[in-house]
C-alpha cells in the first residue's frame, strides 16, 4: 500500500530541510598547482597571498609562499611532496607559520614545525607563536652585564659571554665546535637558564647521541632540541633556526633567561641557497642569493637582553621588575680555516665576537682548541664575574707573550733567564687551559686554577703533571674549604680574605705532594 503524506507534513519536511541548509559563505582564495619539483610548487591563480603565508595543499600538506610573482606563486613544501600532482587545488589560509611554545617543550625533541619526534606523546601546550618576528628595538634593550658561564676556563677567562650576547663558534670540521656548545648547555643546569639546541642538517644518529649525552648529564630537563636532520627537506633545515628562536623567545619575553645554539648556520645557508636556486632567484657570490646576509642578521638580531619595561608590556603587567635575555651561540663550519669566505664573514660581522677553534691545536691535543689570539668577545667583558675578571688578565698576556717567544725560540740556541721563564709560564698556561669534554668547571675551581698559575705556584710542577695537580687541588679545596668554594660559586666575589684562603690552601696542598 502506497504511503500518502499530508500537505502539512510535506511543508514541515521542506521547512526542516531549509533550516539545515548552511547559508554562511566562506571566502577562499584558490589556485592551481602548475608544477611540482624538488619540493617547490608553482601555483597559478592565487591572489592576495602574503610573503611567508601558509598555503594549503591536498592531504593536509602545507607550503610556504616565498616568491610572489605577477602571474604565479612559488612556494616551498613543508614535508613530503611526492603525492602532489599538477592540477591540484591550492588554497590560501590567511596565516603565517607558527610553532608551539611554552615550558612544556623542555625535555622534548621536536622537528622544525614543533611536532614531537621523541615518542613521548603530545606536547601538552596550546600556545603558538610565529616563526618570523621583528627583533626588539634599541629602546627596549638593556646592556649585557650578566654572565653566561660555559664551564670552560679558556672561554670564561679570555672570551667571556654575557646574557643577551651573540658569540660565534667558528672552525673547521672536527675541531670541537658542537662539544663546546653542548658543554655550555650542560653547565646551565641549576642556573635557571633554559636552553634550545637547534640541529641543522646533521645525521639523525649524531642528534640521537647528543640527546643521550644531555640526558646522562641531567641537562635535557632544561633543554628543547629542535632537529632538522640531513634527510629532511631544505625547507625544514631553513626554517628550523627560526622555529628554535621562537621557542627561546618565549622565555625572554616573560623575564627569564635562555640560551640557543644553532648547529650550524653554514648548513642553513646551503639549504637556503638550494631553495633560492630552485625558485630561480638570481645567484650572487658563491651562488648564494643576495639576501643571505639578511637570512642570518634577522635571526641573530632576535637574541637580546630586554628591559623590565619590555617584559612588563609584553606580559601586560603580570611580570614586573625582571629583564629577559636570549643568548645565541651560532656555529659556522669553515673550509681549511678560511674565515674570509662569504658566510663566515657575514656571521662574524653580525655577532658580538667569535671563538675560533683551530685544527692544528686540536690535533696537538690542546682541547678545547681555542686560538686566543684571534678569538674575541666584544661585549662580554662587562658581564664577567668579579673574581674571574680580576684574575684572568694575566692569562691572555702570558699566552700572547708565549706565542711570540715560542716562534722566536725555535731559532735561538741560548735563551736568557727572563725569556725562559716566560716560555715555561706560557707552556703551563696552555696546558692548564686543556679540559675534558662533558666536564664543565665551576667558577671557584676556574679561579683556583688561574690564581695558581698566575702567582707562580705551578712553575715547579712538571708540565705533564699539571692536570693531575689541578684535579687534586680542586678535591683538596672541596674537602677542606667547602664553605669558601660555595661562597665563591654563589657570589663570584673577590677580596683579601678569599685571596688569603687561596694562598694558604694552595701552599698546604703543595706540601702534601699527593698529585
UniProtKB/Swiss-Prot annotation:
Protein name: ATP synthase subunit alpha
Gene Ontology MF: a single term: ATP binding
Gene name of this polypeptide: atpA
Key words, A-Z: ATP synthesis, ATP-binding, Cell membrane, CF(1), Hydrogen ion transport, Ion transport, Membrane, Nucleotide-binding, Translocase, Transport
Subcellular location: Cell membrane
Subunit structure and binding partners: F-type ATPases have 2 components, CF(1) - the catalytic core - and CF(0) - the membrane proton channel. CF(1) has five subunits: alpha(3), beta(3), gamma(1), delta(1), epsilon(1). CF(0) has three main subunits: a(1), b(2) and c(9-12). The alpha and beta chains form an alternating ring which encloses part of the gamma chain. CF(1) is attached to CF(0) by a central stalk formed by the gamma and epsilon chains, while a peripheral stalk is formed by the delta and b chains.
Family designation: Belongs to the ATPase alpha/beta chains family.
Gene3D superfamilies per UniProt: 2.40.30.20, ATP synthase alpha/beta chain, C-terminal domain (1.20.150.20), P-loop containing nucleotide triphosphate hydrolases (3.40.50.300)
Amino acid at each position: 500500500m502506497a504511503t500518502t503524506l499530508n500537505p502539512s507534513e510535506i511543508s514541515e519536511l521542506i521547512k526542516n530541510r531549509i533550516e539545515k541548509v548552511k547559508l554562511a559563505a566562506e571566502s577562499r582564495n584558490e589556485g592551481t598547482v602548475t608544477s611540482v619539483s624538488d619540493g617547490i610548487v608553482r601555483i597559478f591563480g592565487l591572489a592576495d597571498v602574503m610573503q611567508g603565508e601558509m598555503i594549503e595543499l591536498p592531504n593536509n600538506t602545507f607550503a610556504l609562499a616565498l616568491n610572489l610573482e605577477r602571474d604565479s606563486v612559488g612556494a616551498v613544501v613543508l614535508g613530503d611532496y611526492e603525492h602532489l600532482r599538477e592540477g591540484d587545488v591550492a588554497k590560501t589560509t590567511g596565516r603565517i607559520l607558527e610553532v608551539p611554545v611554552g615550558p612544556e617543550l623542555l625535555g622534548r625533541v621536536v622537528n622544525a614545525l614543533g611536532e614531537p619526534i621523541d615518542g613521548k606523546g603530545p606536547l601538552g601546550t596550546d600556545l603558538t607563536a610565529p616563526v618570523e618576528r621583528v627583533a626588539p628595538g634599541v629602546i627596549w634593550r638593556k646592556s649585557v652585564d650578566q654572565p653566561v658561564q660555559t664551564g670552560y676556563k679558556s672561554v670564561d677567562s679570555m672570551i667571556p659571554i654575557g646574557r643577551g650576547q651573540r658569540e660565534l663558534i667558528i672552525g673547521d670540521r672536527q675541531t670541537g665546535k658542537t662539544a663546546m656548545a653542548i658543554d655550555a648547555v650542560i653547565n646551565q643546569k641549576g642556573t635557571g637558564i633554559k636552553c634550545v639546541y637547534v640541529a641543522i642538517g646533521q645525521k639523525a644518529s649524531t642528534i640521537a647521541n647528543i640527546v643521550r649525552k644531555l640526558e646522562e648529564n641531567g641537562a635535557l630537563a632544561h633543554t628543547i632540541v629542535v632537529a632538522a636532520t640531513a634527510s629532511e627537506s631544505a625547507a625544514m633545515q631553513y626554517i628550523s633556526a627560526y622555529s628554535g628562536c621562537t621557542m627561546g623567545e618565549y622565555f625572554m619575553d616573560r623575564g627569564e633567561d635562555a640560551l640557543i645554539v644553532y648547529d650550524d648556520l653554514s648548513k642553513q645557508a646551503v639549504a637556503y641557497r638550494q631553495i633560492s636556486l630552485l625558485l630561480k632567484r638570481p645567484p650572487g657570490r658563491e651562488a648564494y642569493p643576495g639576501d643571505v646576509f639578511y637570512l642570518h642578521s634577522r635571526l641573530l638580531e632576535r637574541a637580546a637582553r630586554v628591559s623590565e619595561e619590555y617584559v612588563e608590556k609584553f606580559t601586560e603587567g603580570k611580570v614586573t621588575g625582571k629583564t629577559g635575555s636570549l643568548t645565541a651561540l651560532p656555529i659556522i663550519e669553515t673550509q681549511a680555516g678560511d674565515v674570509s669566505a662569504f658566510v663566515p664573514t657575514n656571521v662574524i660581522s653580525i655577532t658580538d665576537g667569535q671563538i675560533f677553534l683551530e685544527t692544528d691545536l686540536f690535533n696537538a691535543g690542546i682541547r678545547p682548541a681555542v686560538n686566543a689570539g684571534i678569538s674575541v668577545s666584544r661585549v662580554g667583558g662587562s658581564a664577567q664575574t668579579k673574581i674571574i675578571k680580576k684574575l684572568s688578565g694575566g692569562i691572555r698576556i702570558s699566552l700572547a707573550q708565549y706565542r711570540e717567544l715560542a716562534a722566536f725560540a725555535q731559532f735561538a740556541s741560548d735563551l736568557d733567564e727572563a725569556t725562559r721563564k716566560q716560555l715555561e709560564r706560557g707552556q703551563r698556561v696552555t696546558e692548564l687551559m686543556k679540559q675534558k669534554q662533558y666536564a664543565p668547571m665551576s667558577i671557584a675551581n676556574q679561579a683556583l686554577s688561574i690564581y695558581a698559575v698566575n702567582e707562580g705556584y705551578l712553575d715547579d710542577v712538571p708540565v705533564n703533571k699539571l692536570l693531575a695537580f689541578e684535579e687534586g687541588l680542586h678535591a683538596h679545596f672541596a674537602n677542606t674549604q667547602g664553605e669558601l668554594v660555595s661562597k665563591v660559586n654563589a657570589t663570584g666575589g673577590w677580596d683579601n680574605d678569599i685571596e688569603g684562603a687561596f694562598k694558604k690552601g694552595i701552599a698546604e696542598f703543595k706540601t702534601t705532594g699527593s698529585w
